[in-house]
Amino acid sequence: MPKKDRTDQAPSKDVPKPEEGEVICVVKKMLGAEHIIIACLDGKERTARIPGRMRKKTWIKEGDVVLAAPWDFQPTKADIVYRYMNDEIRKLIEEKVISRDVIDQLRG
């Protein structure tokens, strides 16, 4: 049997945008034990925790852009909600959710 032609593209999924209580951040440093330091768009540096559902499925490294949810009772800490891929970052820039300059500044 001949191979099927797979030229059709996968349906594009929606890029998660920050909702109330969430902020876009850039990973600054890996601390180990599933903890990282992130620099957020609101100007704060936080210690973030990678939840168990993301530990093996989503690999996070320094310089990645992530969506984080700061804790209500301890604002210097946060949980990682989502890691943006490069094409998703481009979509966020096109939709003017974030600017390229801010991301470059946070990445250092």
Swiss-Prot record:
Query: GO MF annotations for this entry?
Result: RNA binding; translation initiation factor activity
Keywords in UniProt for this one? Answer: Initiation factor, Protein biosynthesis
The record's section on InterPro entries has: NA-bd_OB-fold, RNA-binding_domain_S1_IF1, TIF_eIF-1A, TIF_eIF-1A_CS
- Pfam families, sorted: eIF-1a
Q: Does the keyword Protein biosynthesis apply?
A: yes
**This protein's record includes keyword Protein biosynthesis:** yes
- Provide the S1-like domain boundaries: 11-85
Q: Which SUPFAM superfamilies match?
A: Nucleic acid-binding proteins
- Purpose of the protein: Seems to be required for maximal rate of protein biosynthesis. Enhances ribosome dissociation into subunits and stabilizes the binding of the initiator Met-tRNA(I) to 40 S ribosomal subunits.
Entry's family note = Belongs to the eIF-1A family.
For this protein, the record's HAMAP family field holds: aIF_1A (MF_00216)
This protein is called: Translation initiation factor 1A
